[in-house]
């Protein structure tokens, strides 16, 4: 398995991959919890949402927020990105939820190769506290316009 591809391809899972790579072992989360995330995403037809929940080490909340600002601004300009927002849990300030909406898997793949994304993931690799969780969703009720 090409770990650098996995690093980019699994979005916020990348910070756990980076930790594992530093120890010369397989990424535990990729193996145990999300072995087929990219395969699952590839099966999605059309637009989809990706919800990623993760925690950072206590005291690193501001580090994440500062690192996320340029990535969020650049990502919202990317082809196929309809939503890209970082939310912070009000009851547990070390917990964050990234809500993304993409026109296609191909658009998400391009996003994962962007320098601003790689930079954010590199920061997350240093400050993450545990593995992320992922939800792949399809919007079923359209808002009224």
Predicted features, each with a name:
Residues 1-8:
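Bacterial N-terminal signal peptides that target proteins for export
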Residues 39, 72-97:
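Short, glycine- and small/hydrophobic-rich beta-strand elements in well-ordered beta-sheets
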Residues 8-18:
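Bacterial N-terminal signal peptides
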Residues 48-55, 85-112:
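Short, well-ordered beta-strand segments in beta-rich or mixed alpha/beta enzyme
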Residues 58-83, 116-120:
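Short amphipathic alpha-helical segments
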Residues 76-79, 112, 124, 128-131:
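Sec/Tat-exported extracytoplasmic proteins
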Residues 23-47, 86-91, 120-145:
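Glycine-rich beta-strand-turn "strand-cap" elements at beta-sheet edges
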